[in-house]
């Protein structure tokens, strides 16, 4: 009712209000006579987009500035500043003087420089370090057009026989090296690439090195990785680094899961349990090399799997692809009696 806009056209014959507008919904949007010439009244139309913009504008304006009159603010400021300089804490000053302001608001006003006192006058606040406000990088929405999980499912329907690979990133120490993992869904085979940092540029560089390594074996990246499915981590945002070959021609399809939906790539998530059985959460990868990562995943892929009737993921991969491609990915054969599935494996790292 508040956001209805009055419109007139060539059919309007009077300035009077239509009787139908005196009751709900108070607008002409659903009226069958809205576009008919036999309605002589001005039209009152509700525009949802305009109403939403007005609502958001009011919402922002209502939260701007200080919710006190000029006199109230200066009175509060004088009392608080005087009390703090006398050695009282802020909460005590507020309650002792029955001020209609919260402790959080006072701290925020001090932080903004509205008071004559500063953080240096607050013994405890001066000791506190500012909170880290670092925000993780994510894949821009525009990049995901045509690459959403819905698009992925449609692509699988059109190409039911195609094999796809799930990708993820395993975090070690926050801010340190990470491992970008690849899970071949059809054979439960996993390998990883060690990244110096969790950025799109670093991921793109490692992918290019992998493509060059496969090319040296006479294999195109797109032949082994026709379809990739990953999450919304910022390290995957350079989509063309994954999709295009060394000749810059498209050879791979990259798709993204919906935000906060790890269950859409369950195979790589489940296989990470084998990884975490060896490497505990929070373990730093900073001293690791790519050879260490290769050794780790070689042991993981050597584990016998029930779903393969006692065969290992390595056995299945070399049968479906080849030993040469496994070598190119850095994964080697480990005899069953030598397989280690605990943290003891880390002692073999050089």
Model-flagged regions — what are they?
Residues 1-284, 288-289, 295-299, 303-305, ...:
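Secondary-structure boundary/capping micro-motif
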């Amino acid at each position: 009712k508040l956001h209805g806009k009055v419109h007139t056209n060539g059919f309007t014959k009077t300035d009077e209000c239509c009787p139908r507008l005196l009751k709900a919904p108070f607008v002409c949007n659903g009226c069958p006579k809205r576009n008919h010439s036999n309605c002589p009244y001005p039209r009152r139309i509700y525009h949802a987009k305009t109403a939403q913009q007005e609502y958001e504008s009011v919402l922002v304006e209502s939260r701007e500035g200080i919710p006190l009159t000029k006199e109230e603010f200066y009175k509060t400021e004088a009392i608080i500043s005087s009390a703090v300089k006398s050695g009282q804490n802020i909460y005590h000053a507020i309650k002792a003087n029955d001020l209609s302001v919260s402790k959080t608001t006072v701290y925020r006003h001090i932080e903004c420089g509205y008071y004559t006192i500063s953080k240096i006058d607050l013994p405890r606040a001066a000791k506190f370090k500012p909170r880290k406000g670092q925000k993780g990088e994510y894949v821009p929405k525009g990049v995901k057009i045509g690459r959403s999980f819905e698009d992925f499912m449609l692509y699988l329907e059109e190409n039911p026989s195609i094999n796809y690979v799930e990708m993820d990133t395993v975090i070690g120490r926050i801010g340190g090296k990470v491992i970008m993992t690849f899970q071949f869904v059809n054979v439960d085979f996993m390998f990883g690439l060690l990244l110096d940092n969790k950025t799109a540029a670093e991921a793109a560089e490692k992918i290019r090195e992998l493509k060059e390594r496969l090319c040296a074996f006479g294999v195109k990246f797109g032949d082994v990785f026709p379809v990739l499915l990953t999450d919304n981590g910022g390290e995957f945002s350079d989509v063309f680094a994954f999709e295009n070959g060394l000749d810059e021609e498209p050879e791979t399809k990259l798709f993204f899961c919906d935000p906060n939906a790890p269950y859409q790539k369950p195979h790589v998530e489940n296989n990470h349990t084998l990884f975490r059985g060896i490497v505990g959460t929070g373990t730093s990868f900073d001293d690791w090399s790519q050879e260490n990562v290769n050794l780790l995943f070689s042991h993981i892929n050597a584990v016998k799997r029930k779903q393969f009737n006692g065969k290992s993921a390595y056995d299945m991969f070399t049968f479906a692809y080849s030993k040469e491609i496994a070598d190119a990915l850095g994964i080697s054969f480990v005899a069953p009696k030598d397989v280690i599935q605990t943290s003891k494996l880390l002692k073999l790292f050089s």
